[in-house]
Amino acid sequence: MNKKNDINRKIFCNFFKKYEEGLTYIPYPGLLGHKIYNEISKLAWNKWILQQTIIINEKKMNMLNKNDQKKIENYMIKFLFKNKQQL
């Protein structure tokens, strides 16, 4: 990945269904992280981060707990991809 080309790159954001500024880094490990990098805009990712904080606090999740980690990952997939796409 060339950092110089990552700045201000435009992608078609699957969250907003339009071209938006892409992320400058892969925000999550594995194939899911690459999918987010390629298909989710910086603005959509920031919306998820805010939503994630709300979910963790309301459901009193512990991010050191593997079950809670998997739950928040599932919430993230549903939020970002509207549960319409297979990973």
UniProtKB/Swiss-Prot annotation:
Gene3D superfamilies: Fe(II) trafficking protein YggX. One of its GO terms (biological process) is cellular response to oxidative stress. It comes from the Bacteria. InterPro entries: Fe_traffick_prot_YggX, Fe_traffick_prot_YggX_sf. One of its GO terms (molecular function) is iron ion binding. GO terms for cellular component: cytosol. Transmembrane segments: none annotated. Keywords: Iron. Could be a mediator in iron transactions between iron acquisition and iron-requiring processes, such as synthesis and/or repair of Fe-S clusters in biosynthetic enzymes. NCBIfam families: PRK05408.1. Monomer. Belongs to the Fe(2+)-trafficking protein family. This is Probable Fe(2+)-trafficking protein. It comes from Buchnera aphidicola subsp. Baizongia pistaciae (strain Bp).
